[in-house]
């Protein structure tokens, strides 16, 4: 990767991290989209996205906990199954065409998610057995693709009225953090490599994550940004579809 390409990559990662952190996400699906558009090899994408995810999700978790929005009782039913499933799936090696199709599907889901408005509603009790099943399924996808799973958990919690949008974001951040660490642990068991540009991308992700997390806590209109992000994700998904 040339110096100019690295500058472009880091800049885009920073912007993506800010956008995702503003809704309590780590941004792995966005990082995968950026790497796809810049032609990063599939072998590098999964570990790179997970590492960036850990950094941004950690910042978002700290911000939401300090702001008092985090609720442990909404998190643990998903975690008890998602962490082991993410670890096992992370250790599983899949062929490149299958990997690309899984990422394309994930990006499409993420894009659709960006166009769904967030509304407060009457909150229902969280059914623990169902949450455990959902957590396991999200964990498998997280480990296989290289995401934290928040892009799936957040809309589900809101649509099922298990949490307000802000509570869902506050729960998704640590969920993403721990799932990403589990996925990385699984990958580590089979070995992976990272490129030098990842350290610059990590710095960009940290800066973007700080900006986005602060913006989320202080609130602000995110609708047009979310829709623009949805379009970017759809473009990246299309690229994965035609190259798989």
For each predicted feature, which ranges?
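Transmembrane alpha-helices of multi-pass small-molecule transport proteins
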Residues: 48-63
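Small-residue hotspots at the loop-to-helix junctions and early N-terminal turns
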Residues: 42-47, 169, 173
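Short hydrophobic/aromatic, small-residue-rich stretches within specific transmembrane helices
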Residues: 49-53, 172-176, 198-202
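Juxtamembrane transmembrane-helix boundary motif
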Residues: 1-22, 26, 30-42, 59-141, ...
